[in-house]
Structure formats: C-alpha cells, structure tokens
Curated annotation (Swiss-Prot):
Residues 750-938 form the Reverse transcriptase domain. Residues 112-141, 1551-1561 have a biased composition (Basic and acidic residues). Mg(2+) 1 binds at D815, D890, D891. PANTHER family: ENDOGENOUS RETROVIRUS GROUP K MEMBER POL PROTEIN, RNA-DIRECTED DNA POLYMERASE-RELATED. Capsid protein p27: Self-associates to form the irregular polyhedron core composed of hexamers and pentamers, that encapsulates the genomic RNA-nucleocapsid complex. Assembles as a tube in vitro. Binds to inositol hexakisphosphate (IP6), which allows the assembly of the polyhedral capsid. Spacer peptide: Plays a role in the oligomerization of the Gag polyprotein and in the stabilization of the immature particle. Essential layering element during tube assembly. Capsid protein p27: The cleavage at the C-terminus is slowly trimmed by the viral protease, sometimes being cut internally thereby generating the short version of the capsid protein and a capsid protein C-terminally extended by 3 amino acids in a ratio of 2:1. Residues 1149-1280 form the RNase H type-1 domain. It comes from Avian leukosis virus. Reverse transcriptase: Error-prone enzyme that lacks a proof-reading function. High mutations rate is a direct consequence of this characteristic. RT also displays frequent template switching leading to high recombination rate. Recombination mostly occurs between homologous regions of the two copackaged RNA genomes. If these two RNA molecules derive from different viral strains, reverse transcription will give rise to highly recombinated proviral DNAs. A motif (Nuclear export signal) lies at residues 219-229. Residues 1502-1550 bind DNA. This is Gag-Pol polyprotein.
Length: 1603
C-alpha cells in the first residue's frame, strides 16, 4: 500500500503541480475503495478498466452523502494516471517507429494500457509505471529501423511479415507539460537514414511514387527540436510535416523554423505580421490533418488551441457544404470516388486515425488544399479573438506629429484589425481624410481622384508639403523663432537676475520696449508736469508714487512684486495662446472698468483700462502697467503663461475683481467676477473666460474683427405655479474635503460666467460627488424649485429611428459641449436658482451665487435645450431640405447624399451653432467609418446597438425594472421576441423597489440568447429606391412585426415591432394582429414618411377570403399590395406559430350532448351533470382555495373535455363564464386564471362547442331549468343545514348561538348568517372578551398618544402603561409620527425595561413599516385593538385621563391656569410621573414602582369551568387572576393562559382535591370567597360528590342570573 501511495503521489506532483493531493488523502481514498470492494489490491489502480467504475461509485457517494473529498482526490489521481499513460504510449510508439526497440503499444484507450511490472521512484529519476516492454526498448540495438510486428502481421498495414511499410504514426501528446517523452532522451542521433533533407535547407527533388512503395522518409529530429524549444517552453513537443506536390511524401521541417516561430509567437503575439508571415510560409504547401493539429499545438496555448479546433471545424463544414452542392468540387476528387466528409477532412476516417502515412495515401489533393486553407483561416480568427487589435478608429494625428508617423500608426492598427483585406485600403484612405490635421485634410481633399492607394496618398502629401505656401501656422512659427530670443532674454533676467557686462541689462525697457537700457534711463520717460507733486511712497517732491525709484529698485526697473503668502486656492492649468499682432485699426479693443472687491484698504477701488479681446486666450491677463500697485497678487500652481514667443511669468489677483465692459453709449455691460492673471505683457487681454461670462464673442465678418453680444432672445422664460412663494432650504453641512472641492468648482463656474453673485431670497442646497476619475462633480438639489415650476410639454416624442437614414449616405456626428451652459437663463428667473457656499465653522460670511445659464437638474432644462437648438437649426433645415439632420438633446447627426455635400453642410451647421453661442467639441466630431450615435453604431448599410454586458447584476425589483427598460430600448433594433422577454416580465411583479430578486435559470438562458442576438442581428438602413415592406406573424407569447425590404427573399429589417401586453382577460389572435398591423402602418408613416408598399400577411388569410372584418378595418385606406404567404424566415428567432381562424364556440345549440355546470362558494365545489337515459350523471371537482369564478371556469372546462371530438352544449348560470367563453370563439391570448383554464380546454377540442346561459332558480319549467337545478343541488349539497339556518333566521332573527344549536352548524357559520342579514347587521358583531393584561411586569404594555393643549407647542404626549404594575412613562412630542413613537418606546425601555408585547391602536405611527422594523429589531410583539373602539385600550385611556388631571392640578398649583411656559413643561411633566409612579393609587398597598420591580409570585387558584362559544361549560381550568369583570385562567393540561370575562367563569366543584387549595391562594383571589355562587357550591360539595349524577339545582339559577 505504501509503495503504491508513494508512486501515485510522485505522479500527481509531476502532472498536477501545486494542486496535487497529499499522501494522506491518497491513502484515505485507497482505503475507501478497498472497503467498498472497488479494488482488490492497490496495484489494481493502474488498470484502466477500473477507472470508470471508481468514478461512478465516488460520484454516486458524493451525491448521496454530500461528501466530495474522495471524488476530488480521485479526479487529480485519474488525471495523473492518464497523463503518465499517454506519455508512456507516445514514447513507446516513437521508439518503435524510429527503430530503437520497444514493443507495439496500442493507440490511446483505457483498454490498451499495460499494467506496469515495476514502479519508479521519482526522486531517483526512474520511469513511472515502467513496463517490461519499455525496459526492452532501452536495451534494443540502435541500428534497428524496421517496423515491429505483433503476431504474424505487420502493425502498419496488417499484411504478413516482410512488408515494405517504413513508418507509422506517433499520436500527438494530448497533455501539456515540459517534461514529456523522457524515454526519447538522446534519440536524436539514432533516427532513420536516407530520407529527405530538412525543410529550410537545400532539398533535392523527390521522385513521385505511391505512399506504400516510397522509401522511408526521414522524420524530424525530435531530440534536437526539444533541445531548441527548451528555452522558449512551447506547450507541446510535436513536429508538423508537409506533403510535397510531387506525391504523398513527407518533408521534415527544420527544427530552427519551429523554434523561431514559437519564439515569434511568444514575443510578438499571434496578430503580429511577422507571426502571420511565418505561419503562412509554413502552411504554403498542403498539410495533413495530423500535421496541422501538431503545428497548432506547438504555437497555441491550451485555450487558443480549443478555440482553433472549433473554428477549424466550422471552416471544414463550409467546405463540406460546398462539396455537397457541387459533385465536381476539388474536395470530391472531380467527381471520382466517394464524397468528402468531416471525418476524412479531420483525419478520423478508417485507416487515418493516428496514421499520417495513411492520411497521405487516402486523402485527395483537393482535400489537402481545403484542410490547409481552412486551418489557416481558423488560425486568423483565433488570433483576432485571443489578441484583439487596438481601436484604429480612435487614432488621430497629433498637433506636432508628422504625417508619416501618423500613417505608420494608422496602417499598423488597420492591418492588425478584423477588417477584411479588401476593405483595409479604403479605410486607411478615409481615415487620412478625417483623422489627419486640418491642413493635410485640405490637401487630401484636393488630391486627384486617380490616387486610390494609401501609398499614393502618402507620396502626394509629402510632395505637396515641400511646396506648400506659407500658412497662418507657418507665420506663427516664424514669428515665434524671431521673437523668442527677445522674450527669453526678459524671462531669464526676471528669473535669474542676470545682467550683461558692465552692469547693463540684457532685457527690454518697460517704457519703450527697446533693449540696452532700463526704464529709469529711458529717454522717452514721461516727466512729471507738477514739480511740487509729493510722492506717497518716499514723501519726496517732484514725482508721484508710480515714478518713485524706491518702488522700482536701484536702477528704476521694476523688480518682482512682493508676493502674499499662500498658494492660489484654485488648481488650474492655464495654457494661453496670445493673439497675433494685428494692425491697430483692426485690433478689437474695449474700455474696461476693474473694481477690487477685497476688504483690505487700497488707494483705488476702481480703475479704467483698455483691453484687447482675444478669443485665442484661455484666461484673462491684466498687464502690470494697468494693474494698481497696492492690489495684492499671489503665486499660482503654474507660474508661467505659454505663448508663441515662449513662457512669461504670471501671478494671480488675491482678491476677486469685478470686470465690466463700457459700451459706446457709456452704459456698463453686466459685470463679471473673476481672479485675473497679472503678467508683464504689452496691453491687457480679455480671454475666453471673460468673453463667455460677458456674453461676448469674437468673430470674423468680411475680414474685419468685431465684437458681438450673444442675443438674449434665446432665453425662454419659465412658467411658475400661482403659489410660487420663495423656497429657502438651508445648505447642508459638508466635510472639509468636499467643501474645498465645492469651492474650487464654484470658482471655476464663476470664472466661466455660468454663475453670478446673488442676494436672492431663494436658496437650495448644493453638494459634490466623486466621479470614477477621482475628480468631483457639482450638483444642485432643485427638487423644491421644480415643485414650483409648471413643466413644459414634451417637444420630441422619443428618439429618432436611425435605420431610416438612406442607405449608403455618409454620416457626421456633432456633440454640443456643455449645451445647458451655453443657453442663458431668463433674467427674471435667475434668483430662483440661488445657492450658498458655506465656510467651516462659519469663519466668514457665506457667499451666495445664482445660475445665469440652464442649471442641470431643473425639470425644464432638457425641453428648453431642445427648443433653443431646434430654433437655431431651423433656418438650415429650410435651406437644405435634402439634408437629413437628426437632433436629440445635445447630439446632432448629419447625413447627405455625398461626402462633399456633407462636409459643406457640416461646416455651415458648425458655424451657425458657434455664432449662436454654442461650442462644438472638435475631438467629438465623428465621421464614417465607426460612427456612434445614441448608443448605436452606424455603418454605411447597418445600424447595430452597442454596450450589452456579459451578465447584469440583479438583486432587487428596481434592478429588474432598469434591465427591462434597457431591453425595451434595444427591442426595435434587435428584434427580441416575446418569449425571451417573458422571464424578465415575470420578475416585475411587486410594489416594493427593494424587494429581493434573483438571477434565475430562465433569465440566464434568455439573456444568453439576447447577447448572442446582439452579436449577429442589426438593422439595415433604408434604401429609398426599393419598396418598403411590412410583415406580421404570431409567435410564442405574443405577436411580432417588422418593417424592412426584401422580406420574402433576402430580408433586410429596418424596424421591429411587437404586440402590447394584453389588458383584457382574453384577446383573440385576430385582434392582436389587427392592432399590430395598425401599429405597423403608423410606424411606417412616422419613421419613413410613407405608407408600406407591400404588406405580408400570414397564410391563413389566403385561405379565408374575404378578409376578416378586423383586418379590413386595419387596412382601411391602404393602397399598397397585400400578399399572403408562409411565415418569412426572418421570424425564425421568434418561433412563429400558425394562426387559426376557425370558430370554436357559438351561442346557438349544436347537435350533441348537453351538460349543466355550477359551482358553490360555500362547499367550494364545481359540478358537471348530464342525463344518461332516466338518470343524471355527475362529476365533481373541489378546491377550497379557488374563487367561485375559477370553480365555474374549471367546471365548464371539465364539461368541454368530456367529448373533445363531439359537438357539445354547455349550459351554465354564470354570466361571467358564458361571456368569456363566447369571446374565446377563436384562438387568442389569455391573461387571467379563468381564461387560461378555458383556453387550455378549448385547445384540446376539435369539435364545435355551444355555451348557453340560463338564470338560476327561475320558475320557468322545462329541461334547462331542471338540469340547472340538479347541478345547483349537487354543488350545494352540504349547504342544506346552512339554508335552513338562513330560513330560520329570516323568520325569527335569532342569534348565532341559537342558530348553531338549532341547525347543527358551527359558530362561525352561524355568525356569517347573522352578518348577512341587513336588519341584524346594523352594528358589527363583536365577541365577548376582555383586555389581555400581563401576569407580571414587562409582559404587556399599552401605548397611546394624547393631546394636552397646556403643553403647546409640543402638546402631544406619548403614554405607556405596564398592564401588570400600572407604571407609567410619558414623553413630549411636537407631532404624532413613527419617529416619535420609536423615541418614546426607547425612553420607556430605558426606564422600565424591554417588554414582550405592546398593544396600541391602529394609528399610522404604530403600524408603519419603519415602526414594524424597529419593533422587530428589539424583539417585541405588537398587536392593535379594534379600530374606532377606545375600550380596546382601556388601561392606557385611564392613564391618559389620570395624567392630564395630575398635570392640570400641578399647573394650577404653580399659577399656570392655561398654557404652561415651555421652560417649565419638562419639570412639571417629570413631577407628574413621579407622583403617579412612586405613591400608592386608590386601594393598592404598593406603589406601581414597587409592583414593577418586586412583583408578587402568582400561584394557581381554585379550579373553575369556562363557557366556550357553543355555550357549554368546559372543565380543566384554574384561576390565576381575578379582577373587576375579568379573570385570567390557566389550563391544567396545556398550561395555556387566557383572559375571559368574569361572567363566563364559575367554580368547578367536581375537583375535590383542588378546593382545599382555596385557603392557600394568593391574596389576589381573596374576593372570590365572598362570591355567592362560590359559597353555594362550597356548601353543596358533599351532596354533589355523593350523588354525582344529578345536576346541581343552583346552576340553573346561576344561568338565569347570567342571562
């Protein structure tokens, strides 16, 4: 045993690696197998014949006992045994065919492995399971090269000894491992001689000949290949061979070729062009199936190899299909011999399995070519799947990237993509036109049409670039080179403080701009006109502070300013492109006023400057010459501005600056708040941040730069409700991190001009959320404001159908950047969208802002966005009627009949939108190919959805709702049939969004089909030249329709339509198809603007002429063609069904048997009766859980199935069933339980059925009345006593107890009879009972809310009383809510402890979901009293009254006659609780607190009898508590305790032994001894015991007194 365990453990470590089982687990498994009798000895485990029985036995044991440890261990051991066995087989056969000794080993199979004679020790390098044959193989002479024989026949061909067979096959090793074929070590020099030279070397021409007569070919040097591959570690050591064109002879491959290919795959990947070239070179000659599979095992891993096998099989099936259609197909040998099949092509036919020589002899040349081509195509598919190519559609030419580098990247990505070779060149050329830089795009558009290859385009662009004229970019580059030395000199001097020789500056003068001197030495320096002017900086005369040398430094040149401490709070990345120099007359200059809003003292609050409008600058820059010297500045995160001339140092204003533009008439444009940059530039610049905020835009009209103001007529006023009083909701507190992020986002929006300071009386909260990228997003909670708005009506009824775009038209997609923020908000509405930016700990006054543009989250923003964009685009729609322009929110799609027309229209649309104030994202402009719009991918001929996940996460009802919504969006594009939507519709039942849902098997299977459908199905774009067709069909669980073209021949679907969910109990298929045809015609007009040209109807309508009335109504006004044909193949995915127009039910009698049906709710039975001769036959069904309507339907269904092939008349008194059955005259869709029952019965009938309705209990004589009475009597057979009770009550109106006794029915049935009486049911029938009390403290509490006006404003008091100890707990609340009740109970639990149960009324505060959850968490049971009946809460009601009286007395004693001051309410309430709980009440000798914390132990009192519902007295009870009108009794057998009225309790004098316990009873029962009936019973005790047969006389008297 130990030796076997050691051998198996070694084998498992070799072949299983880290997952190998331990020796202990192997020993336990072997012991179990021997115990179960599956192994006679441990060595039997080596026999393959025992493997299957062991596997079956362990699997059965795991399923029965749930223990799978031994089965898991056996799985690992079995894998190791099989791997060792396959290695042994391959090694033996390889040695055998190489002539190195060894014996014949059968092909792989459990029955052919030999039992090892010895076992090896892995640590000493011995063979695993080494057989005697293997040992002999090692001893065989090396020169042996002839095939071995078994018996008297050759193993190769089965002929006698001495045949000329030269070689045989070695099956490919099926297991992955680097240590395979250990017995072939050192065999490389012992291979057979005289074969062909290796492939890759110089090869002599082989003589053609038959395979069986050719000399033995030289096999590839396996040991040498193994040595070569040891470093790269290929998955399997195997050598492919090729077939020469001269004949079926093998040519060995050069091992270095295989090594190089394996290394190329490992380093370059499968999709590399080098890999593809080497694989195609190796497969340039026809290969055998044996060679193909071995080659793929070498270069592919296990998973890609499995994918390749599947893909190869698919390709071979295509070859077989072509060969089946054409008998003279090359694979069929030009019609000679048997046709090809899959077994032949895979080398699995007779004589080919594991025999490459047999494959070479039996396979035809055409088959070899097909095998090799299919294998190569499968390899390409696997390479695409295993290593997906990069997205070539996303490659664009960078701003500084050369065209050659861009072309290299693009061509490499396209060549490695999934595109077919014929489509790659057009795609590359099209990407050149769209993805290159704008100037190169213009060159390509101007290229001659004769340039049709990428190489020609590249050469043309390079040639044109050499001779291209000077462009704006070229001028800018030249200017940059010219002025860079000058600007950098200034920058270096400012940065390093360096000067030239002699102390002279190397920079420029700030006054005149000339180099060589400082500002102080400038000859053009302005002199002061007032010599007596006093400097405020140095107190000197003759100059002002601006000219003071102390300010400018030693030489008068301005040094760097003193910077305030602390970094700039807003993290920005300014990248400014300064405006190019213009002529002075064309420079767009404006007059600007700057106002400092800081709180520190400055000399000037406002200054006037002249600034240059520059739409190329990102931010606003104020020149240091214009910047007041006492306005502080701070450092920024980016200390430089980058422009054409290089970098310039910059700072930012520490205070917020108000900037306003002065118009020509002197008026001031709306001011803008911002933090401008301050730098050493010649003149101030207003950048895009300022232009957008002020509503200014720099445009170029007729070559002259002007300034335009965006018109405010685009602002659409909002509509407010009549009571739109201002809403003020305090800002939520935010943590410091989020507050900092909010501050940064607000400052950014302020600089962009989207918000402005506000003093509005409106306020709603703002907050931030973190995005997936790590940045924050600003959100504004506008729910309260939306409640005051009147929503606008929808202006766009859904999204456009993209398949309506004409087929082949080029497309362009535009994206409006920040569309909401580009549309102004009406000025009168802005104050309603104000918010507050708080500070931590209120360290500073809060800053308030309001939106100037459409805010996100406002209910009217989407509608206004659509209206404004549509208004801007309307003139273009009128100007270009043939242009297709799809507009949905901020996404635009343009389609034109030509590329030139599309480009022209696109430029016009972009310019129109930009003039209106919108921004187009250049990087989001899409052109074909690869256009995506509204979640769909559009090609020149198709429209396909994108974005389906592998498997969605489903946990709640809301998750299912979202998933169904997404599928509904995709259904018109994918054609998802109703049967696949059914499992998801089933999960939508419920009302709680958080209700748990699971991803069940039906949903999983349906989702798999939907995902598969999304990869294959797509809509086809409409071709206006072809007729538009429509078709409808019935399918599983509904009906389906489609609009398309060529539906009956080559279907091209354009839009899918589906029937709606049924809203009636039953809908006939004819009605469903009628509604679907109407919907199809309306969709065609709405989507394509035309009626359907051809309508395809199911074949049933061809057989039923004229058409049914419903179909004719649906076709009213239809002028197209109608065709009736079989269901088109496009509906196969929906599993179409035949539509039958046969009438199944009529309301006229038919010749055949007549049956009567009825059902009763009292007996819960349904019956069917019919007359057979003189007597009635009866059939019954019973179901206590079914309704009367379902019982009636089941009875009719049972009647219909009595004679399925015979016309039958069904008579029923149920109008509901009769009407429904008549509506089900034709096949249809049921939606209720009764309809499903009837439809199932009708579907099983083949004959006509007639349904006849009669009125029940009518006095009309005849056969129908008689049959109905018989059915009614059988259905209500057990209700005769109940009918008698009804009659007796109608006559005498007696009570339920009397009815129960008189008619022998239950009390429940008697109460139901009384309650159905309109005269006796004026008040609800209530049982006699008593309020349950606790037998001890903390068993039952009663809680109630009571109103005490003296305690206003918190005038609601929550009162809880312990029903056993009478202890009271009171809390004060402002409103009666669930939260108040939970808070009160938490306080009461802290004072008294946790109760077992609480009784309340049925108020919403006690019965809400949150309250139920709170009680469940505390483990407290909850019950409610009778609604509207205060007696159900008697104890707490008395406690309310007692508490209010105590509060009144205490308040009046303190001088508060009416309202108690708020400051005194808490103290007074505590005094009232103290007085009620800590002092005796009434006749009690203990206080409630004493009874609560020191309760009296109850003992059982005397035996009693109680009166039950039937009026009888039941024995076996003992008294526990006796009170005023109530008692608690305990059952002696079950220990059950119940509360009953005292009038239903009397002593049980028959229990003699128990009477003596009266004296030992608790004082609680002291009053019972004075009870008169008790005394009477005690005095007659002896007499009662003696006679024991005669009823005691006093009992009648007691009963009389009780009544």
């Amino acid at each position: 045993m130990e030796a076997v365990i050691k051998v198996i453990s070694s084998a498992c470590k070799t072949y299983c690696g880290k997952t190998s089982p331990s020796k202990k687990e192997i020993g336990a498994m072997l012991s179990l197998l021997q115990k179960e009798g599956l192994l006679m000895s441990p060595s039997d485990l080596y026999s393959p014949g025992s493997w299957d029985p062991i596997t079956a036995a362990l699997s059965q044991r795991a399923m029965v006992l749930g223990k799978s440890g031994e089965l898991k261990t056996w799985g690992l051991v079995l894998g190791a045994l099989k791997a060792a066995r396959e290695e042994q087989v391959t090694s033996e056969q390889a040695k055998f065919w190489l002539g190195l000794g060894g014996g014949r080993v059968s092909p792989p199979g459990p029955e052919s492995i030999e039992k090892p004679a010895t076992e090896r020790r892995v640590d000493k390098g011995e063979e695993v399971g080494e057989t005697t044959v293997q040992r002999d193989a090692k001893m065989a002479p090396e020169e042996t090269a002839t095939p071995k024989t078994v018996g008297t026949s050759c193993y190769h061909c089965g002929t006698a000894i001495g045949c000329n067979c030269a070689t045989a096959s070695a099956p490919p090793p099926p297991y992955v491992g680097s240590g395979l074929y250990p017995s072939l070590a050192g065999v490389g020099e012992q291979q057979g001689q005289g074969g062909d030279t290796p492939r890759g070397a110089e090869q002599p021409r082989a003589e053609p000949g038959h395979a069986g007569q050719a000399p033995g070919p030289a096999l590839t040097d396996w040991a040498r290949v193994r040595e070569e591959l040891a470093s790269t570690g290929p998955p399997v050591v195997a050598m492919p061979v090729v077939i020469k064109t001269e004949g079926p002879a093998w040519t060995p491959l050069e091992p270095k070729l295989i090594t190089r290919l394996a290394d190329t795959v490992r380093t370059k990947g499968l999709r590399s062009p080098i890999t593809m070239a080497e694989v195609e070179a190796l497969m340039s000659s026809p290969l055998l199936p044996h060679d193909v599979t071995n080659l793929m095992r070498v270069i592919l891993g296990p998973a890609p190899y499995a994918l390749w096998m599947d893909a190869w099989g698919v390709q071979l099936q295509t070859v077989i299909a072509a060969a089946t259609r054409d008998p003279r197909h090359p694979a069929n040998g030009q019609g000679r011999g048997e046709r090809t099949n899959l077994d032949r092509l895979k080398g699995l036919a007779d004589g080919m399995v594991g025999n490459p020589q047999g494959q070479a002899a039996l396979l035809r040349p055409g088959e070899l070519v097909a095998i090799t081509a299919s294998a190569l195509q499968a390899f390409r598919e696997v390479a695409r799947l295993a290593e997906p190519a990069g997205p070539w559609a996303d490659i664009t030419q960078g701003p500084s990237e050369s065209f050659v580098d861009f072309a290299n990247r693009l061509i490499k990505a396209v060549e490695g993509s999934d595109l077919p070779p014929t489509a790659r060149a057009p795609v590359i050329i099209d990407c050149f036109r769209q993805k290159s830089q704008p100037d190169i795009q213009q060159l390509i558009r101007a290229a001659p049409s004769t340039l049709t290859t990428p190489g020609e385009i590249i050469k043309y662009v390079l040639d044109r670039q050499k001779t291209a004229p000077l462009t704006d970019q070229g001028i800018a580059a030249a200017m940059s080179s010219a002025i860079q030395p000058l600007v950098m000199a200034v920058v270096n001097r400012e940065r390093d403080g360096q000067t030239g020789p002699g102390g002279r500056a190397r920079g420029l003068c700030y006054t005149c701009g000339s180099p060589g001197h400082y500002q102080a030495q400038c000859p053009k320096k302005r002199k002061s006109g007032n010599s007596r002017e006093r400097c405020q900086l140095c107190d000197g005369m003759g100059h002002n502070a601006k000219q003071c040398r102390r300010r400018d430094g030693n030489q008068g040149q301005r040094p760097g300013r003193g910077l305030s401490s602390g970094p700039w709070p807003v993290s920005e990345q300014p990248a400014v492109s300064l405006a190019m120099t213009m002529e002075h007359k064309d420079r767009p200059l404006v007059r600007v006023i700057l106002t400092n809003t800081g709180s520190h003292p400055v000399k000037q609050r406002s200054v006037y400057i002249t600034a240059l409008l520059d739409s190329g600058a990102d931010i606003t820059i104020i020149s240091e010459e214009d910047w007041p010297t006492d306005w502080p500045v701070v450092d920024t995160a980016n200390p430089q501005i980058h422009g054409i001339g290089g970098g310039i140092p910059m700072r930012k204003s520490r205070d917020m600056i108000e900037l306003g533009v002065i118009n020509r008439d002197g008026s001031l444009e709306r001011p803008l708040l911002l933090f401008p940059a301050v730098a050493m530039v010649r003149g101030s610049i207003l950048g895009r941040d300022c232009l957008q905020g002020l509503g200014l835009r720099l445009t170029n009209l007729i070559g002259k730069a002007t300034v335009l103001t965006v018109a405010l007529h685009l602002a659409i006023p909002l509509k407010w409700k009549p009571d739109h009083t201002p809403v003020w909701i305090d800002q939520w507190p935010l943590p410091e991190g989020k507050l900092v992020a909010l501050t940064q986002l607000v400052e950014k929006e302020l600089q962009l001009g989207h918000i402005e300071p506000s003093l509005s009386c409106w306020n709603t909260p703002v907050f931030v959320i973190r995005k997936a990228s790590g940045s924050y997003r600003l959100l504004h909670d506008l729910r309260a404001v939306n409640a005051k708005l009147v929503p606008f009506g929808a202006v766009q009824q859904g999204a456009p159908v993209l398949s309506a775009l004409p087929r082949g038209w080029p497309l362009m997609v535009l994206d409006l950047k920040d569309c909401f923020f580009s549309i102004p908000l009406a000025e009168q509405d802005r104050e309603a969208f104000a918010f507050t930016l708080p500070s931590v700990n209120n360290q500073a006054p809060a800053r308030r802002f309001q939106w100037k543009v459409l805010p996100q989250g406002m209910t009217c923003s989407p509608t206004i966005c659509q209206l404004v964009v549509g208004q801007v685009l309307e003139p273009l729609r009128l100007k270009h009627p043939s242009l297709r322009m799809l507009h949905y929110m901020d996404d635009l799609l343009l389609a034109a009949s030509s590329h030139d027309g599309l480009e022209a229209a696109g430029e016009e649309v972009i310019s129109t939108l930009e003039r209106a104030g919108f921004t187009i994202s250049p990087d989001k402009i899409q052109r074909e190919p690869g256009v995506q719009y509204l979640g769909y991918k559009l090609g020149s001929t198709y429209v396909a959805p994108v974005g389906l996940v592998a498997e969605p996460r489903i946990a709640t009802l809301w998750d299912v709702q979202k998933l169904v919504g997404s599928l509904q969006w995709l259904r018109p594009a994918l054609g998802i049939p109703p049967r696949l939507m059914g499992p998801f519709y089933e999960q939508l039942r419920g009302s709680d969004p958080n209700e748990a849902r699971e991803w069940n098997l039906d949903m999983k299977m349906a989702w798999r089909e939907i995902v598969q459908l999304s990869t294959t199905a797509a809509l086809e774009r409409w071709d206006p030249a072809l007729p538009l067709e429509g078709a409808v069909a019935r399918c599983e669980q509904g009906a389906i329709g489609v609009l398309g073209q060529g539906l009956s021949t080559h279907p091209r679907p354009c839009l899918w339509l589906f029937s709606t969910q049924p809203t009636k109990a039953f809908t006939a298929w004819l009605e469903v198809l009628t509604l679907l045809i109407t919907k199809l015609r309306a969709s065609a007009v709405r989507t394509f603007g035309k009626e359907v040209d051809i309508l395809l109807l199911p074949a049933c309508f061809r057989e039923d002429l004229p058409l049914p009335e419903g179909i004719l109504l649906a076709l009213k006004g239809f002028a197209g063609k109608i065709r009736s044909s079989d269901t088109p193949s496009i509906f196969d995915i929906a599993r179409p069904l035949h539509v039958s127009l046969k009438v199944r039910v009529t309301d006229h009698p038919v010749p055949g048997p007549t049956v009567f049906t009825d059902a009763s709710s009292s007996t819960h039975k349904g019956v069917v009766v019919w007359r057979e001769g003189p007597r009635w036959e009866i059939k019954e069904i019973a179901d206590s859980g079914a309704s009367v309507q379902q019982l009636e339907a089941r009875a009719v269904a049972m009647a219909l199935l009595l004679w399925p092939t015979t016309p039958t008349n069904v008579v029923t008194d149920s109008a509901f069933v009769a009407k429904m059955l008549l509506k089900m005259g034709q096949e249809g869709v049921p939606s209720t339980a009764a309809a499903f029952i009837l439809e199932d019965a009708l579907s099983q009938r083949s004959a006509m059925a007639a349904v006849l309705h009669v009125r029940s209990h009518s006095e009309v004589p005849g056969f129908f009345t008689e049959g109905n009475d018989v059915a009614d009597s059988q259905a209500t057979f057990q209700a005769y006593p109940l009918r008698e009770a009804k009659d007796l009550h109608t006559a005498l109106h007696i009570g339920p107890r009397a009815l129960s006794k008189a008619c022998n029915i239950s009390m429940q049935q008697a109460r139901e009879v009384v309650q159905t009486c309109p005269h006796c049911n004026s008040a609800p029938a209530l049982e006699a009972g008593v309020n349950p009390r606790g037998l001890g403290p903390l068993q039952i509490w009663q809680t109630d809310f009571t109103l005490e006006p003296r305690m206003a404003p918190r005038s609601w008091l929550a009162v809880t009383v312990d029903t056993a100890s009478s202890a009271i707990v009171v809390t004060q609340h402002g409103r009666v809510t669930s939260v108040a009740a939970q808070h009160h109970w938490a306080t009461a639990i802290a004072v008294l402890g946790r109760p077992k149960a609480i009784k309340t009324d049925n108020g919403s505060c006690f019965t809400s979901k949150s309250t139920r959850e709170w009680l469940a968490r505390w483990g407290i049971a909850h019950t409610t009293g009778i609604p509207g009946n205060s007696q159900g809460q008697a104890m707490v009601e008395r406690a309310n009254r007692l508490l209010k009286d105590k509060i009144r007395v205490l308040a009046e004693g303190d001088g508060f006659m009416k309202r108690i001051p708020t400051s005194k309410q808490g103290e007074l309430l505590a005094k009232a609780m103290y007085a009620l709980n800590h002092f005796e009440r009434g006749e009690n000798t203990k206080t409630p607190i004493q009874k609560h914390w020191r309760p009296t132990v109850l003992t059982e009192g005397p035996p009693v009898k109680i009166r039950i519902e039937t009026g009888e007295w039941e024995k076996g009870w003992n008294v526990l508590v006796w009170g005023r009108g109530y008692a608690a009794v305990k059952n002696r057998d079950t220990d059950k305790v119940i509360w009953v009225p005292s009038r239903k309790v009397k002593p049980d004098i028959t229990q003699k032994d128990e009477v003596t316990k009266k004296d030992e009873a608790s004082p609680l029962f002291a009053g019972i001894s004075d009870w008169a009936p008790w005394k009477g019973e005690q005095e007659g005790l002896q007499e009662e015991v003696a006679s024991n047969k005669q009823e005691r006389p006093g009992e009648d008297t007691l009963a009389a007194n009780e009544s």
